[in-house]
């Protein structure tokens, strides 16, 4: 950490998933950290407990909130407007302003950098890789976009040589890293509000692969055509290790390294037999879904490449209890009119993610042999909703019943004439469009039956409804 003075850091939007993790590492390293956010939150409270000084609301005077002006100001440019008063104050005082990705890149210097990229599955795969390496005794540093359920944290300053982190492509931040091991889970057009074209989106992954360091390894999912094509493109320039199904491994024999030999879904989870290199292990996944098995393959491949023992990595994967908001179990109704109904919450906000989660929910429902799948979905961003309305409708129709909330605009302004009905009107299952957020739990209760699997889904405020729905269903216990 030589090029940036991190002795006194101020972070705008410090409570965000990515920012709070980096703040944790800075505090562990002895930096004096201050920050601001628009509201109180669990991450803000946790950082205060670690010693950070944090203000709610953005004001110019927040820069000196800890008693001195910062040596550097950190922000997420995608989330923070350029007229933010703290940004303006920093520039007026000639204080360097850097992106969160620049800071993370600085923190990863002198480590073996394990970067997890891809359109979907980054957080789950990164989390599995971390838990696996911990089980293998490697104590990696890490920064994750979600909170590990078991560890209760999203970042750690470890004693091992590996640093595992998500490489976010949404604003091309992944091009600020220097991976020794680069994992690409899948590639599918997204974030077109930033990239404008699919071609520009695909290119950012080519550029990411170009940044793999000499002697490094590119790990790709062979079941995903675009990730597999990336591996094929770079296999003569660096070590490429592919993972996936036996059929995919046969299609790409030159790079196949990790293969799912067998998978069996039961009420207690998913059992998979996985061959990594010349060795085979059995893994029991607590989190359902074929996509989660592929994520486990990515984590095992990265772990072995990082020098860890496969058996110990596999034990860590089998002990993996998930990440907050990734098919996160909120509770079961023990009795009454909705007995044995279960409520889950998931961050899925792209049609492919919705498909994967609902297929996983269906696998779980079929393993139980009873009940239905009910989804309460909140679209995220007007641009994404308009771009993928038909695909969302098809994906959501994998459930048995649905409640569709209005669009969570986040950083975008409303678009006249556009609401979630452009999705719900195309769906082929019973569906209710409910624009009143406070009425959603009641709508779900009207639909619910005993033994149902109910999933709240989306990247916005819908997560607040999981416990509200569970409480409503438990009123009849």
Curated annotation (Swiss-Prot):
Taxonomically, the superkingdom here is Bacteria
Family (UniProt)? Belongs to the MurCDEF family.
Single biological process term from Gene Ontology: peptidoglycan biosynthetic process
Enumerate the UniProt keywords alphabetically: ATP-binding, Cell cycle, Cell division, Cell shape, Cell wall biogenesis/degradation, Cytoplasm, Ligase, Nucleotide-binding, Peptidoglycan synthesis
**Residues given in the record as ATP binding sites:** 118-124
Protein name per UniProt: UDP-N-acetylmuramate--L-alanine ligase
Cell compartment(s), UniProt: Cytoplasm
Q: Which reaction does it catalyse?
A: UDP-N-acetyl-alpha-D-muramate + L-alanine + ATP = UDP-N-acetyl-alpha-D-muramoyl-L-alanine + ADP + phosphate + H(+)
Q: In which pathway does it act?
A: Cell wall biogenesis; peptidoglycan biosynthesis
Instruction: Identify which top EC class this enzyme belongs to.
Output: ligase
Any one Gene Ontology molecular-function term assigned to this protein's record: UDP-N-acetylmuramate-L-alanine ligase activity
What's the Enzyme Commission number for this chain? 6.3.2.8
Q: Which InterPro entries match?
A: Mur-like_cat_sf (IPR036565), Mur_ligase_C (IPR004101), Mur_ligase_C_dom_sf (IPR036615), Mur_ligase_cen (IPR013221), Mur_ligase_N (IPR000713), MurCDEF_pg_biosynth (IPR050061), UDP-N-AcMur_Ala_ligase_MurC (IPR005758)
Function field = Cell wall formation.
